[in-house]
C-alpha cells in the first residue's frame, strides 16, 4: 500500500513558492492507495515457472511494497536486494546475486540496466516488462522489451512487443506459440538440409561410377520445389508437449547429426534408382 500525506498552508497571494514555504503546514490526512495484483496474476506466475521462466521483480518502489506484491503472487521474496546495496557490489558479486535473488527494490533506471545486463552475461535470455519512463533503458537492454498498450508512448516505442491486454497470461500464450514456431522452423531447416545433402551425395556417387548424369540441374530444382511445397504444412504441424516445457537454443550440432543421419538414407534410395537405370539401359 502506498500512502501520501495531504497538508495545507495559507500562502496568501504569494505567486512563487520556494522550498522554505513547505514548513509549518497543517496535516489534513492521508491518502492510501492499494494496487492489488490481478486475480489471474498468481496463476500466470505459476504457469511461467512451469515453462522454466524465472519471474523477477525490478522496481523503484520501497522494499515493503515490493515484498507485499510478491507474497500475493508467490514470487520468492525471502531476500530483497535494494539499489543502495546493489551499488556496493562488484560485477562478479552481482553476477552471483541475480541467480539467487528474485526481488530488487528501490532501483534507479541505471540499476535496472545493470541487472538486466548481468542476467544476459550469465547466459540468460531476458524479457523485460515495463510501462514507465524509468523502464525505457532496461527495455532497450533486454533481449525482448515488452510493454503494454496503456504504457507511456516512449516505453511503447522502446519495446519490441506491445501487449494489448494487461494480463500475464498473454505472456504464457506467447511463449508457448513462440516455442511451437521455433520447433516447426527447426523441422523445416532439418528437412531441407538433409534433402540437399542427400542430393549432393547422390550426384557425387553417380558422377564417380556412372557413365552418364542421371539427374539434371532442372530436375534437382524441381525436387527442391516439391520439398518446399510439402513443407508449407509445417506451421500447422503438431508439437510434442515436452518440446514446449523448456526454452531451447539454436544449435548447429543437432542439425549436423540429423543431416548426416537422414541425408545418406535419402541418397540410398537415389542410388538404388540409379542402379535400376544402369540395368535398364544395359538390358
What are these regions (language model features)?
Residues 131:
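Conserved catalytic-loop aspartate of Hanks-type protein kinases
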Residues 1-118, 122, 136, 142, ...:
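Cytosolic catalytic headpieces and adjacent flexible linkers of membrane translocases
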Residues 77-128, 142, 147-283:
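Membrane-embedded transport module
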Amino acid at each position: 500500500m502506498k500512502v501520501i500525506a495531504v497538508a495545507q498552508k495559507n500562502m496568501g497571494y504569494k505567486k512563487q513558492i520556494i522550498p522554505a514555504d513547505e514548513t509549518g503546514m497543517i496535516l489534513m490526512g492521508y491518502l492510501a492507495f492499494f494496487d492489488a495484483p490481478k486475480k489471474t496474476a498468481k496463476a500466470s506466475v505459476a504457469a511461467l515457472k512451469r515453462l522454466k521462466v524465472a519471474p523477477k521483480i525490478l522496481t523503484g518502489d520501497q522494499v515493503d511494497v515490493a515484498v507485499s506484491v510478491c507474497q500475493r503472487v508467490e514470487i520468492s521474496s525471502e531476500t530483497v536486494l535494494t539499489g543502495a546495496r546493489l551499488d556496493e557490489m562488484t560485477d562478479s558479486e552481482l553476477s552471483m546475486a541475480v541467480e539467487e535473488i528474485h526481488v530488487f527494490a528501490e532501483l534507479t533506471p541505471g540499476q535496472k540496466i545493470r541487472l538486466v545486463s548481468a542476467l544476459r552475461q550469465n547466459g540468460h535470455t531476458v524479457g523485460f516488462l515495463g510501462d514507465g519512463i524509468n523502464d525505457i533503458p532496461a527495455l532497450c537492454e533486454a533481449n525482448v522489451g515488452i510493454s503494454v498498450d496503456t504504457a507511456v508512448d516512449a516505453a511503447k516505442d522502446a519495446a519490441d512487443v506491445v501487449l494489448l491486454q494487461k494480463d500475464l497470461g498473454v505472456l504464457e500464450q506467447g511463449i508457448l506459440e513462440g516455442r511451437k514456431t521455433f520447433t516447426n522452423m527447426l523441422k523445416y531447416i532439418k528437412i531441407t538440409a538433409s534433402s540437399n545433402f542427400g542430393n549432393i551425395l547422390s550426384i557425387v556417387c553417380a558422377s564417380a561410377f556412372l557413365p552418364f548424369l542421371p539427374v539434371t540441374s532442372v530436375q534437382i530444382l524441381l525436387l527442391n520445389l516439391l520439398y518446399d511445397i510439402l513443407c508449407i504444412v509445417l506451421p500447422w504441424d503438431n508439437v510434442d508437449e515436452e518440446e514446449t516445457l523448456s526454452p531451447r537454443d539454436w544449435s548447429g550440432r543437432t542439425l549436423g547429426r540429423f543431416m548426416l543421419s537422414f541425408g545418406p538414407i535419402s541418397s540410398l534410395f537415389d542410388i538404388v534408382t540409379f542402379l535400376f537405370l544402369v540395368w535398364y539401359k544395359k538390358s
